[in-house]
């Protein structure tokens, strides 16, 4: 078996990453994802580069990161992607360090973060059903995912960037069974991020409850 050598020094648009039969494929060659988990809002910005370099020194080739909705949209329609919240710059730093990125934009992320990343103001609508195919919730999810994509969709691997995969929701099987909701989130993510590889993350014991054929 040939393992794709890790380098992004010559990375250009037109690259591709996909799930093959029993292995991931980077430009058609088997690729082993060795991922570290780094959450940029939790790390002071002056230390971002150092933390990424430490992960690479440990033998990692990829950074997984959550996008915390309530960190970026503290009020409806008011977005902050600057300073500590500069998602694009963090992804660019990963690329500068020859690290790929797995993006996990929720909408729910858990991560021992307040409301799993969901904004508090969603609860002002008394009858809202969070993490369900509730019309208002899905409307706000669509707005948020579009805002995130506008920051980093140019950084997907197809566009010469480091983002190889984007996660849909997070461990939803531990919360409920609603394939309609999961499929709606998938469609929103697909619409905004294009042809990047999408995936679900769930416990094996309940993965099939919400699993979709293309995730």
Predicted features along the sequence, with ranges:
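Acidic-and-aromatic substrate-binding clefts and catalytic sites of carbohydrate-active enzymes
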Residues: 15, 40-46, 72-73, 77-82, ...
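Residue-level preference for long, well-ordered alpha-helices that form the structural scaffold
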Residues: 44, 79, 83, 130-137, ...
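Active-site neighborhood of glycoside hydrolase catalytic domains
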Residues: 136-214
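Hydrophobic faces of well-ordered beta-strands that scaffold small-molecule active sites
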Residues: 32-36, 61-65, 101-105, 164-168, ...
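Aromatic-lined substrate-binding rim segments of carbohydrate-active enzymes
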Residues: 48-114, 120-122, 185-196, 213
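Active-site beta-loop-alpha junctions enriched in small/polar residues
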Residues: 38-39, 68, 106-110, 168-173, ...
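N-terminal carbohydrate-binding accessory modules
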Residues: 1-62, 92
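Active-site-adjacent "subsite" loops/lids of carbohydrate-active enzymes
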Residues: 109-150
